[in-house]
Swiss-Prot record:
<dbReference type="InterPro" id="IPR001009">
    <property type="entry name" value="PA/PA-X"/>
</dbReference>
<feature type="site" description="Important for efficient shutoff activity">
    <location>
        <position position="28"/>
    </location>
</feature>
<feature type="active site">
    <location>
        <position position="108"/>
    </location>
</feature>
<keyword id="KW-1048">Host nucleus</keyword>
<comment type="function">
    <text>Plays a major role in the shutoff of the host protein expression by cleaving mRNAs probably via an endonuclease activity. This host shutoff allows the virus to escape from the host antiviral response. Hijacks host RNA splicing machinery to selectively target host RNAs containing introns for destruction. This may explain the preferential degradation of RNAs that have undergone co- or post-transcriptional processing.</text>
</comment>
<feature type="site" description="Important for efficient shutoff activity and nuclear localization">
    <location>
        <position position="198"/>
    </location>
</feature>
<protein>
    <recommendedName>
        <fullName>Protein PA-X</fullName>
    </recommendedName>
</protein>
<dbReference type="GO" id="GO:0075523">
    <property type="term" value="P:viral translational frameshifting"/>
</dbReference>
<feature type="active site">
    <location>
        <position position="80"/>
    </location>
</feature>
<comment type="similarity">
    <text>Belongs to the influenza viruses PA-X family.</text>
</comment>
<feature type="site" description="Important for efficient shutoff activity and nuclear localization">
    <location>
        <position position="199"/>
    </location>
</feature>
<dbReference type="GO" id="GO:0003723">
    <property type="term" value="F:RNA binding"/>
</dbReference>
<keyword id="KW-1190">Host gene expression shutoff by virus</keyword>
<dbReference type="GO" id="GO:0039694">
    <property type="term" value="P:viral RNA genome replication"/>
</dbReference>
<keyword id="KW-1035">Host cytoplasm</keyword>
<feature type="site" description="Important for efficient shutoff activity">
    <location>
        <position position="202"/>
    </location>
</feature>
<feature type="site" description="Important for efficient shutoff activity">
    <location>
        <position position="206"/>
    </location>
</feature>
Length: 252
């Protein structure tokens, strides 16, 4: 899964996800599904914001090409992806400037057109179930909730989807592509089901035990559960695509 994430997502998103997991003391070598989920969530937040601006008349417009002569303001402030200290600094600044009520939990975005914070959700389950979980956690009518699924479904507060249909379709298409790519690599079942993930973990450990008596030297740079994998960077630049080679038991 880690190899897939590094190949599938923009290096900047991968780096932000790594920092987020490190900040919370989580090991991406072990919690690879969480690593993939964080990258997916980050990308959706960025796609949500992409190309959306507010012009001089205060109208929301979509601009896909940079125009240096246009006096435009980004419609959305991206809060997700920042470290907690900086994220709260941005939230406090927005509240002081706009008079918005300070949220109890860090939101993902702020919409300058609608003057509201937005919580973005990406779920592998039913959208309405995840929506209710988000709503029960946030307990604030001031924060707008928008949930996307990998099956193309979505749900938003008061059925207000904020973005135009084309922008939302772009997000849904990307999520569907991620799902298809995972499925083609045999990763989707373990990603969508914790039970399947545990089965895969046991399978990896069993493979490791079978290799224990061989002469194959296993890298200690990876977590115990994933020692049968030996990631090899093809260059030192983190913006390059990760290639991986898999250690196998030698034939007897």
């Amino acid at each position: 899964m880690e190899d897939f994430v590094r190949q599938c997502f923009n290096p900047m998103i991968v780096e932000l996800a790594e920092k987020a997991m490190k900040e919370y003391g989580e090991d991406l070598k072990i919690e690879t599904n969480k690593f993939a989920a964080i990258c997916t969530h980050l990308e959706v937040c960025f796609m949500y914001s992409d190309f959306h601006f507010i012009n001089e008349q205060g109208e929301s417009i979509i601009v896909e090409l940079d125009d240096p002569n246009a006096l435009l303001k980004h419609r959305f402030e991206i809060i997700e992806g920042r470290d907690r200290t900086m994220a709260w600094t941005v939230v406090n600044s927005i509240c002081n400037t706009t008079g918005a009520e300070k949220p109890k939990f860090l939101p993902d975005l702020y919409d300058y057109k609608e003057n509201r914070f937005i919580e973005i959700g990406v779920t592998r389950r039913e959208v309405h179930i995840y929506y209710l979980e988000k709503a029960n956690k946030i307990k604030s009518e001031k924060t707008h909730i928008h949930i996307f699924s990998f099956t193309g479904e979505e749900m938003a507060t008061k059925a207000d989807y904020t973005l135009d249909e084309e922008s939302r379709a772009r997000i849904k298409t990307r999520l569907f592509t991620i799902r298809q790519e995972m499925a083609s690599r045999g990763l989707w079942d373990s990603f969508v089901s914790p039970r399947e993930a545990k089965k895969q973990l046991k399978k990896d450990l069993k493979s490791q035990e079978q290799c224990a008596g061989s002469l194959t030297k296993v890298s200690r740079r990876t977590s115990p559960a994933l020692r049968i994998l030996e990631p090899m960077w093809m260059d030192s630049n983190r913006t390059a695509t990760l290639r991986a080679s898999f250690l196998k038991c030698p034939k007897k």
